[in-house]
UniProtKB/Swiss-Prot annotation:
Keyword Isomerase annotated: no
Keywords of the record: Cytoplasm, Glycosyltransferase, Purine salvage, Transferase
Enzyme Commission number(s) from the entry: 2.4.2.7
Name this polypeptide is given: Adenine phosphoribosyltransferase
NCBIfam families: apt, PRK02304.1-2, PRK02304.1-3, PRK02304.1-5
Keyword Membrane among UniProt keywords: no
Designated gene of the protein: apt
Organism phylogeny: Bacteria, Bacillati, Bacillota, Bacilli, Bacillales
Location of this chain's protein in the cell: Cytoplasm
Cellular component per GO, a single term: cytoplasm
GO biological process: adenine salvage; AMP salvage; purine ribonucleoside salvage
The species this protein was found in: Halalkalibacterium halodurans (strain ATCC BAA-125 / DSM 18197 / FERM 7344 / JCM 9153 / C-125)
Catalytic activity: AMP + diphosphate = 5-phospho-alpha-D-ribose 1-diphosphate + adenine
Pathway: Purine metabolism; AMP biosynthesis via salvage pathway; AMP from adenine: step 1/1
C-alpha cells in the first residue's frame, strides 16, 4: 500500500519553509490506519519483542496499537515532569535548544526485548535519547519502527546499529 497518499503535507508548518507530514489523515481512515499498524506489528513480531516503548506524543498513537496487536505491554516516554513515579531522564538537543525525556525507573527489566515506535524519524534526536534510556534500564532495543522517515535529514545515521523499519520514506 502507498501510505503517502494518505498523509497530508502541510506547507509552512510549524514554521516557514517546513513541509509538515500530517499522519492524522492516515489515522482517520480506519482501514489504512489498521494496515499501517498491522505492518509495523509484523515487524515487532519478527523481533520477538517483550515491550513496546513510544515517545510523547505521537509515539503513543503508533506504539499503543502495536503493543495491543502483538499482546505486549506499552511503556510511555514523556517530557520532564509528566510521570508520577521515580524516573530516569536524558537531555537531548533540538534545533532551538534542549529538552528532557523521562521514563519510569521500573518500566523495563534487564534483558527485555524492546521495540521503540514513533510516527516520524527526522534528525533522530528523540529516538536516540529514548534508546539511551531503554539501554540504561537494561533493555535490549531489537527494533525501531516509524510510520514516516525523512531520509533527507539523515536521522537513520544515528541509529546504524539498530534494525530500523519505516512504512514510508520521503527523500
Amino acid at each position: 500500500m502507498d501510505f503517502k497518499q494518505h498523509i497530508t503535507i502541510v506547507e509552512n508548518f510549524p514554521k516557514e519553509g517546513i513541509r509538515f507530514k500530517d499522519i492524522t489523515t492516515l489515522m482517520q481512515n480506519g482501514e489504512v490506519y489498521k494496515r499501517a499498524i498491522d505492518e509495523m506489528a509484523r515487524f515487532a513480531k519478527e523481533k520477538e519483542v517483550d515491550l513496546v516503548v513510544g515517545p510523547e506524543a505521537r509515539g503513543f498513537v503508533v506504539g499503543c496499537p502495536i503493543a495491543y496487536a502483538i499482546g505486549k505491554g506499552f511503556v510511555p516516554v514523556r517530557k520532564a515532569g509528566k510521570l508520577p513515579r521515580e524516573v530516569i531522564s536524558v537531555d537531548y538537543g533540538l534545533e532551538y535548544g534542549k529538552d528532557r525525556l523521562t521514563i519510569h525507573r521500573d518500566a523495563i527489566q534487564k534483558g527485555q526485548r524492546v521495540l521503540i515506535a514513533d510516527d516520524l524519524l527526522a534528525t533522530g534526536g528523540t529516538i536516540e535519547a529514548t534508546v539511551q534510556m531503554v539501554e540504561q534500564l537494561g533493555g535490549e532495543v531489537v527494533g525501531i519502527a516509524f510510520m514516516i522517515e525523512l531520509g533527507y535529514l539523515n536521522g537513520r545515521d544515528k541509529l546504524v546499529t539498530y534494525d530500523v523499519f519505516s512504512l514510508t520514506t520521503y527523500e
